[in-house]
Design a protein with these regions (language model features):
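Active-site-proximal loop/helix segment associated with metal-binding centers of metalloenzymes
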Residues: 96, 112-195
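Core catalytic region of metal-dependent phosphoesterases/phosphodiesterases
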Residues: 5, 10-109
Length: 195
């Protein structure tokens, strides 16, 4: 069985047994796919104790947790996990059954082919993106903190990798071509702004 949900932003309450009782009948062969903004890999430099508890809690659910990335992920840390093959595509395993589905990959899950392509452009950056090594960082941040415009800090709360690279797009095209450009499902965080 495959279940799909949206943004979690590190809030996994929806996976409590009281909220999601279907899991009583699930096994690790069953999957829950989060369509971006997983948020479980967020702390700046390393896994925090809170993240470790959350990831261990997800690992102990009876199902396998899968996610594509959104625009609110710590890509420095996410991309530091080893790349592995899983069900036909490339992944990062956060835990044995907490798995990041990498962009441009086709997975065979529960008899279905699934094309995964995460990422999105941040809409919450009207105030701009600050550089932490800017000599005027504190002054700029203080000014933005007093205003209404949301902003992000490069490699702290925003990463350019939120948008797919040319290589990821090309790999996606090649992987789709290898499947005759036919899959059962496409899992992404956000549709193109041109649609």
């Amino acid at each position: 069985m495959i279940y799909i949900t949206g943004d979690c932003h590190q809030d996994f309450e929806r996976f409590n047994i009281d909220v999601f009782p279907e899991q009583k009948e699930m096994t690790k062969d069953d999957c829950v796919i989060i369509c971006g903004d997983f948020g479980g890999v967020w702390n700046r430099n390393e896994e925090s104790s809170r993240e470790a508890k959350l990831m261990d809690w997800l690992e102990n659910r009876p199902f396998t947790t899968l996610f594509v990335d959104g625009n609110h992920e710590n890509f420095d840390r996410l991309y530091a996990y080893p790349v592995e093959k899983w069900h036909g595509g490339k992944v990062h395993k956060i835990r044995p059954s907490v798995i990041h589905l990498m962009r441009g990959q086709v997975f065979e899950i529960d008899g279905k082919s699934i094309f995964a392509f995460g990422g999105a452009s941040s809409h919450d950056i009207a105030g701009g993106i600050l550089e932490p090594d800017d000599p005027d960082f504190k002054k700029k941040k203080k000014k933005l903190d007093q205003g209404w415009y949301p902003y992000r800090v490069n490699h702290v709360s925003w990463w350019k990798q939120e948008l797919p690279s040319e290589e990821e797009m090309q790999e996606g095209i090649e992987n789709l071509a290898a499947h005759d450009n036919k899959v059962d499902f496409i899992v992404t965080h956000c549709c193109a702004s041109s649609t």
